[in-house]
């Protein structure tokens, strides 16, 4: 995807959605995020709808720093050229890399749980409650890596009975999934 293709969807989108390769491995995440955007009438463009765009982290881990820098520069240009105000990411790894490695000059970078919380608080998204018990696992990169603990819990507590896990927050146990499956 290049900047011209992204801009064709909306001249000045409110949001650019970047799913990331881990979300592409679990397509229901992408479908759910798009369902939320539709329900809240979010004007957005989908940066990596067809896959093929990477945040650069796998390249960094492989020691390919030059390729990682090129990827980051290309992504940065695409995002800045889109005219979006907010970049929403569903992959905690991508979220951390965009926060730490990208200089997006005034573009807000949010994990999708943070954005959903905002949509609910603004009254743009209505949640339906149920009687289900919900246990939330803090992903390493999102929790310990970026300090995002409360937003997911705020949203989940509005849709069900949020149950405290034996180990959560900084004490949460790593699932081992991060980039090990790539």
Which residues make up each language-model segment?
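Iron-sulfur cluster-binding electron-transfer modules in prokaryotic oxidoreductases
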Residues: 1-182
């Amino acid at each position: 995807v290049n900047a011209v293709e992204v801009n064709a969807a909306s001249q000045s989108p409110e949001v650019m959605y970047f799913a990331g390769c881990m979300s592409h491995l679990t397509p229901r995440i992408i479908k759910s995020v798009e369902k939320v955007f539709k329900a809240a009438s979010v004007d957005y463009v989908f940066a990596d709808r067809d896959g093929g765009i990477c945040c650069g982290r796998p390249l960094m881990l492989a020691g390919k720093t030059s390729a990682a820098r090129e990827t980051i520069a290309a992504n940065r240009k695409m995002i800045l050229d889109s005219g979006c105000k907010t970049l929403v990411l569903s992959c905690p790894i991508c979220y951390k890399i965009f926060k730490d490695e990208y200089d997006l000059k005034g573009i807000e970078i949010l994990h999708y749980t943070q954005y959903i919380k905002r949509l609910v608080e603004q009254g743009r998204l209505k949640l339906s409650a149920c009687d289900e018990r919900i246990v939330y696992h803090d992903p390493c990169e999102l929790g310990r890596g970026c300090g995002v603990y409360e937003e997911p819990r705020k949203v989940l507590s509005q849709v069900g009975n949020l149950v405290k896990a034996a180990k959560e927050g900084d004490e949460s146990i790593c699932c081992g999934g991060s980039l090990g499956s790539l």
